[in-house]
Swiss-Prot record:
It comes from Bos taurus (Bovine). This is Mitochondrial glutathione transporter SLC25A40. One of its GO terms (biological process) is import into the mitochondrion. The gene is SLC25A40. Solcar repeats lie at residues 13-131, 139-223, 233-327. It comes from the Eukaryota.
Length: 338
């Protein structure tokens, strides 16, 4: 067989370069997606003001964060009065009255968790994919599923205790000494496993999402390349594949997202009010209760807002990440020539 027909030789990218590419993608994604969630939260707070101690979910496009209302007045960014008539009106009034930076309110503290989680996730996925392909062959279709599951498990396991600490620090201003005492007391009373109390509901949604996302992304990318007669995907092929695969995974896993949100919120109520945790209901039981109360459609509450958030986030993240890797591949290829 003519070696030319097999496409160009693949130039490897180092783990450090993968980390840099994923970090860049994570920051760009959060900068582009966060304004939509900020506006959504401001509209929610306008219609149903958040009381002190109330928690709400804040998304920067990379991961969801449980945030707790701290102050009674209008000092917090999500409590500022706006008199918005809708989404577009909220965008315009926030920019005009508060400055464009207000569209990224609350972002910096969440990036401390979201960027490392994304870097771990994407770098582990690529490293695992390369390892599995070297063992099982390039065309093994199960590789993206396995690599996606393991990478997501690893990222959530590393970040989950840190996110618990971040939420606690945000709900009450702790010094580092007080935080150390809080963690020590929690571990002595409930064991080390208590630091991963939010792990299960997150895994419930993120692992199936990751498996479906990476499998469909790789399949779509290959199909679009074949249709275009290309060996390597373009920026738009990566962008389109990311948006479509992310949208599909978002729809299928939405019931788990609804359950995750409910479990996270209940967990925070018990933690913050020092109420002893009752025997937790299983995911299946919570789903049955939702269906009994709101019908089958209750499992798909928030579908449109989730798609509006997930599709562009997945598209921007993966296309930026692949662009970064492509840039480093060219740099590495040039070094090999000289």
């Amino acid at each position: 067989m003519d070696p030319e027909s097999e496409g160009p030789a693949v130039i490897t990218v180092t783990p450090l370069q993968q980390m840099f590419a994923s970090c860049t993608g994570a920051i760009l994604t959060s900068l582009m997606v966060t304004p939509f969630d900020v506006v959504k939260i401001r509209l929610q707070a306008q219609n149903n003001p958040f009381p002190k101690g109330k928690c709400f979910l804040y998304s920067n496009g990379l991961m969801d964060h449980l945030c707790v209302c701290e102050e009674e007045g209008n000092k917090a960014w999500y409590k500022k009065p706006g008199h918005f008539q809708g989404t577009l009106d909220a965008f315009l009034k926030i920019i005009r009255n508060e400055g464009i930076k207000s569209l990224w309110s609350g972002l910096p503290p969440t990036l401390v968790m979201a960027v490392p989680a994304t870097v771990i996730y994407f770098t582990c996925y690529d490293q695992l994919t390369a390892l599995l392909r070297s063992k099982l062959g390039e065309n093994e279709s199960r590789i993206p599923i396995v690599a996606g599951i393991v990478a997501r498990l690893g990222a959530v396991t590393v970040i989950s205790p840190l996110e618990l600490i971040r939420t606690k620090m945000q709900s009450k201003k702790f010094s580092y000494e007080e935080l150390h005492r809080f963690v020590s007391k929690k571990v002595s009373e409930d064991g080390w496993i208590s630091l991963w109390r939010g792990w299960a509901p997150t895994i419930l949604r993120d692992v199936p999402f990751s498996a479906m996302y990476w499998y469909n992304y790789e399949v779509l990318k290959k199909w679009l390349c074949a249709k275009s007669g290309l060996y390597e995907p373009t920026f738009m092929i990566n962008f389109t594949s990311g948006a479509l695969s992310g949208s599909f995974a978002a729809v299928v896993t939405l019931p788990f997202d609804v359950v995750k949100t409910q479990k996270q919120t209940q967990l925070w109520i018990y933690e913050s009010q020092k109420i002893s945790m009752p025997l937790q209901m299983s995911t299946w039981t919570i789903m049955k209760n939702i269906v009994a109360k709101n019908g089958f459609s209750g499992l798909f509450t928030g579908l449109i807002p989730r798609l509006i958030k997930i599709a562009p986030a997945c598209a921007v993240m993966i296309s930026t990440y692949e662009f970064g890797k492509s840039f480093f591949q060219k740099q590495n290829a040039q070094r090999q020539r000289y």
